[in-house]
Amino acid sequence: MTEASEINLSDIKGPIDVNTPITNHRTALIQNYSTKPKLTYQTVFGVNGPLVIVHNVKFPMFNEIVKITLPNGQIRMGQVLESSKNKAVVQVFEGTTGVDAKFTTCEFTGDIFRSPVSLDMLGRIFNGSGKPIDKGPPVLPEDYLDINGQPINPFNRIYPEEMIQTGISAIDVMNSIARGQKIPIFSAAGLPHNEIAAQIVRQGGLVQLPGRNNETVNFAIVFAAMGVNMETARFFKQDFEECGSMDNVCLFLNLANDPTIERIITPRIALTAAEFFAYHCGKHVLVVLTDMSSYAEALREISAAREEVPGRRGFPGYMYTDLATIYERAGRVKGREGSITQIPILTMPNNDITHPIPDLTGYITEGQIYIDKQLHKRLIYPPIDVLPSLSRLMKSAVGEGMTREDHSDLSNQLYACYAMGKDVQAMKAVVGVEALSPDDLLYLEFLAKFEKNFIAQGRYENRTIVESLNIGWELLRIFPREMLKRIPETLLEKYYKRKKQ
């Protein structure tokens, strides 16, 4: 086999297959290591937080990448946030510690931030800037892609219709996730959102139905951590290794002791890799982003350093638009085999769902999975509260041919009974058990069994969709048939067969 070092790119002549790796790599080299003259300045005017202000710059361009060389020779990367006639405001991804206004030099490259991508990135661990930190060799890039991605034409989007089976009943039956959907996990500090996300990653796959051709899928996972502690990063890495999926996982880790400003580019680099796996390699990619609250706080820090007019709780007014540039990169595209499904995790400050971060996230994404503190206190795992949880694409991913014909009606009836049980429980605290009617007592019984048998399950318990639906019917048999108003008579005839006492 010919060594890569022996290949002279200038010796390749004649027609070239554009799909060969050597051609892709040659194109990437020409594109990124151009010999255009670059401009270097030693005119740093000042440093403000994560920002460096450079004066007397000729034609600075918005989003242009800047190489900043410190007096000790260390090189850091930055990006132009604001440009005027002869001034540029540069955000430094690795932080501004050690930047000397007199001796620091800035090289304006004239290009945007492009991330090297390759199929070899699977099974590797990178820092928040996309550099390997697993003591492995550098990745040989197949291409260099803009980290901001390319906007998908809405006409070319495919509506998500294939349900992902997570093995968790509270999600599969009540809040079904479709392939290509973006659905966040709303949690709070101290709740097991990491364990739930790891279980979804471990057990996630297409619905396996008896009598149907259940093909194996080309699956990959991209995990991006922003501002997490070492314990969280180690938990996910260990979980991926134990379940044997580490070869299909690409990890990007920005830890709590890493520069805050780096959190701005970490999710974008991760999604650029995911888009390459999905749209160029035909893989079905699941992207887990944690913690989006840390990302939003980094955004607020930059906004404060630029002295912009703050919005609610000090967050910038453009945070909605900025979050949308991340969340909207999920989906499916016509003519491409792969898909991107996003599960962002965000911890709500003070468990407040009206906080700007979960509030704006809920506007953009297609539903949410809500982790409840009260269920967690009662040792129910996973503590998913099905009432505020929602999946807006569930209606197109369930039903006959996809899951089972009773799925939608069964879910509606379980919702109604659980909500009624909650109302009766609140009323019982006021008037006492003696004042409750026989129907109210049935709702209380259903409430207890629903949380114990349906919501609660083991961390490694993988229920099929059929098993979860059957558990739902077992619970509804608590009620007489005439009380189940939301299920058609034909389905009751088929599935409601009450055992004789």
Curated annotation (Swiss-Prot):
Gene that specifies this protein: spe-5
Binding site for ATP: R392
Any single Gene Ontology cellular-component annotation: cytoplasm
Pfam families according to UniProt: ATP-synt_ab (PF00006), ATP-synt_ab_N (PF02874), ATP-synt_VA_C (PF22919)
Biological-process GO terms, alphabetical: ATP metabolic process; intracellular pH reduction; positive regulation of programmed cell death; spermatocyte division; spermatogenesis; vacuolar acidification
Keywords: ATP-binding, Cytoplasm, Hydrogen ion transport, Ion transport, Nucleotide-binding, Transport
Name recorded for this polypeptide: V-type proton ATPase subunit B 2
Subcellular location: Cytoplasm
